[in-house]
A protein has these predicted regions:
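N-terminal signal peptide
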Residues: 2, 12-32
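Proline/serine/threonine-rich low-complexity linkers at boundaries of modular beta-sandwich domains
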Residues: 66-85
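A positional/structural detector of protein chain ends, strongest at the extreme C-terminus
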Residues: 1-4, 191-192
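Transmembrane alpha-helices of multi-pass eukaryotic membrane proteins
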Residues: 7-8
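Short amphipathic alpha-helical molecular recognition features
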Residues: 27-31, 37, 92, 110
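Solvent-exposed loop/turn segments flanking beta-strands in beta-repeat/beta-sandwich domains
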Residues: 111-115
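Extracellular Cys-Trp
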Residues: 32-61, 189-192
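Beta-rich interaction modules in large eukaryotic scaffold/regulatory proteins
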Residues: 79-107, 117-191
Length: 192
């Protein structure tokens, strides 16, 4: 009789331990994700909009986006703050200053009252510059695009950051190319 009780206690303890392990593993799967859309592909995860992070149902009083499988007001990646896809690729002439406009969607009201920045990645370097939000467009301040390679063009991306710490990013980015006209005078940016 005591052996049956002991056996059941061991089984219950083991099950409770394993359940906690499964929950901890699921939590770790969420916390390592930095994209809203990717977060919502994991059934145990939710996206905290204000905190701009993926968690396992730990958003508190934050706006929460749930996976599409959950019946909720904000459910699925269509509610993720993101750069609008399908914008035409930008092409810049190396050495020229240009302003960039990025169309975004799913802007939550409180976001509009925070500072905005654009993060430009080109030539293996990251540059963060001031930006302004007007309606659903982010206007990045003028930036001198340079192709520092020996290639006719280099590619880069620009993404959108918001909040006072500038660590909260919209999903997605806008691609661009920077042409060296001395190596490729047929580049669209060189014929302007």
């Amino acid at each position: 009789m005591y052996s049956n009780i002991l056996h059941n206690v061991v089984l219950i303890t083991l099950c409770a331990f394993l359940f906690e392990c499964v929950l901890a593993t699921e939590k770790d799967k969420c916390s390592g994700v930095s994209s809203c859309a990717t977060c919502l592909t994991k059934t145990m995860c939710t996206w905290c909009v204000t905190k701009s992070r993926c968690t396992k149902q730990e958003c508190g009083n934050d706006n929460v986006i749930y996976p599409k499988s959950v019946v909720a007001l904000l459910s699925g990646p269509d509610f993720c703050p993101r750069v609008v896809e399908g914008q035409k690729e930008l092409v810049f002439k190396s050495g020229q200053r240009q302003k960039i406009t990025i169309k975004i969607t799913q802007i939550y009201l409180y976001m509009a009252f925070t500072p905005w920045k654009c993060k430009i990645n080109v030539n293996g370097k990251e540059h963060v510059i001031i930006a302004t939000l007007i309606v659903d467009n982010v206007y990045c301040e003028s930036f001198e695009f340079k192709n520092e390679s020996d290639e006719p063009y280099v590619t880069g991306t620009v993404s959108v950051l918001w909040d006072y710490e500038y660590n909260k990013a919209f999903d997605g980015s806008l691609p661009f190319r920077v042409c060296r006209c001395d190596l490729d005078d047929s580049c669209v940016a060189c014929t302007k």
